[in-house]
Regions:
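Ser/Thr-rich low-complexity repeats and stalk/linker segments
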Residues: 16, 132-233
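Short, solvent-exposed loop/turn segments at conserved positions within beta-propeller repeat blades
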Residues: 45-49, 99-105, 160
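Acidic/hydrophobic-patterned starts of short beta strands in beta-sheet-rich repeat architectures
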Residues: 29-39, 84-89
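Acidic, small-residue rich beta-repeat scaffolds with periodic aromatic anchors
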Residues: 7, 77-136, 153-155, 166, ...
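Beta-propeller fold detector
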Residues: 63-72, 120-124, 177-179
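Beta-propeller blade repeat segments, especially FG-GAP/WD-type strand-to-loop junctions
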Residues: 2, 47-68, 110-114
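Terminal domain-start segments
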Residues: 1-24, 120-124
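Beta-propeller blade termini
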Residues: 18-29, 77-84
């Protein structure tokens, strides 16, 4: 109760606590304030695993709508809800950080799509420069016909000018993943990318989420992420 739960059966211990960082705002477009809260889970080891949880206001009662794992011992500085999205300002572990001491400044954005809380955007500040992936076309929720092209831009080109991409259905089913090349004047300079998709052979219609990711070559973590949400006909 009171935002905390724990159990100890003599062999195993487990506790979960709602942290004192949260936000109120409309997440589903019904004009009523919902909530975003941060939960920390402790299974008795050294880890402290945090998640962001979307909570709908359903006829005045809180109903958990979706949850996304943030990681072990990340530091959530602030939570905000605007434009039906959850925005987090956090410190995550960089490649050389011990788990106890995160120092990588990130901003993360989450959307509730169907019944899943999706990470839609991540930016990181590395060496004083912000790594961002901006989708320039098409617009979010746009109707597209196979084949369709997604374009984007980055202010700082990734290692070897390579971005990964992942295609998902709104229920979390992964359709495909691969990589693409960024066109730029060299690593660390601004760049652009363009990728054409054709999902007709997979028989996929309806909404799909395509995530473009800059991956750390040091530890495989996400440095930047940009997403396109399109309705495929």
């Amino acid at each position: 109760m009171n935002g905390a739960f724990s159990v100890n059966n003599g062999t195993d211990t487990y506790s979960v606590q709602m942290l004192n960082v949260y936000a109120l705002g409309d997440l589903n477009g019904d004009g009523v304030d919902d909530a975003a809260v941060i939960l920390m889970e402790d299974d008795g080891g050294t880890g402290r695993f945090e998640s962001v949880v979307a909570v709908y206001n359903t006829a005045g009662a809180p109903v958990q709508a979706g949850q996304a794992i943030l990681g072990d011992r990340v530091l959530v500085n602030s939570v905000d809800i605007s434009s039906n999205a959850i925005h987090l300002d956090i410190l995550a572990q960089g490649p050389s950080d011990p788990m106890c001491c995160p120092s990588l400044a990130q901003k993360q954005t989450y959307w509730m799509i169907a019944t899943t809380l999706w990470q839609m955007r991540v930016t990181s500040t590395v060496g004083g420069s912000e790594h961002v992936i901006n989708i320039t076309s098409p617009a979010e929720w746009a109707d597209v016909n196979n084949p369709f092209t997604i374009t984007g831009a980055v202010p700082i080109s990734p290692f070897e000018n390579t971005l990964a991409y992942h295609i998902y259905l709104p229920n979390g089913t992964k359709v495909n993943d691969a990589s693409l090349m960024v066109t730029s004047g060299g690593m660390g300079t601004p760049g652009t990318f363009s990728q054409t998709f054709n999902l007709s052979s997979a028989g996929i219609t309806g909404y799909v989420i395509i995530q473009f990711v800059e991956v750390s070559m040091a530890d495989g973590s996400t440095i930047a992420l940009g997403s396109a949400l399109v309705n495929v006909h």
